Regions:
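Short acidic, Gly/Ser-rich segments with clustered Asp/Glu that frequently serve as metal-coordination loops
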Residues: 10-16
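Short glycine-enriched, charge-decorated loop/helix-capping segments at active-site entrances
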Residues: 17-24, 71
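Active-site alpha/beta core segments
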Residues: 29-103
Length: 103
């Protein structure tokens, strides 16, 4: 049995987000194309999302990018949503991480 775990394909980690990674949007689309072609070969497909409710000192206006970060993936914001190019229709379950602590 094989499972596929897809990690944090969220707006804040894609271009235009508060903690963007170059190529994030293209990766979201590539994952969707992969799922369309190969998703049926996995017994389970799940995803995680960084989802901060109260991250404490994890967020900073002057982050060091080691122990503190700019605000990102705040629960209930557009940045915390999955990127629109990531088709979640094959995702069985989403696991939220980082609610009250760094993920």
């Amino acid at each position: 049995m094989r499972a596929l775990v897809i990690v944090d394909v969220q707006n804040d980690f894609c271009e235009g987000g508060s903690l963007a990674v170059e190529g994030g949007a293209a990766t979201a689309g590539a994952i969707s194309r992969f799922l369309a072609a190969e998703g049926g070969s996995y017994a389970h497909v799940v995803a995680s999302r960084d989802y901060h409710v109260d991250p404490g000192a994890h967020f900073s206006d002057q982050p060091d990018f080691s122990t503190s970060w700019p605000p990102h993936c705040v629960a209930g914001t557009a940045g915390a949503e999955f990127h629109p190019d990531f088709d979640t229709s094959r995702v069985e379950m989403v696991f939220s991480t980082g609610a009250h602590a760094p993920a």
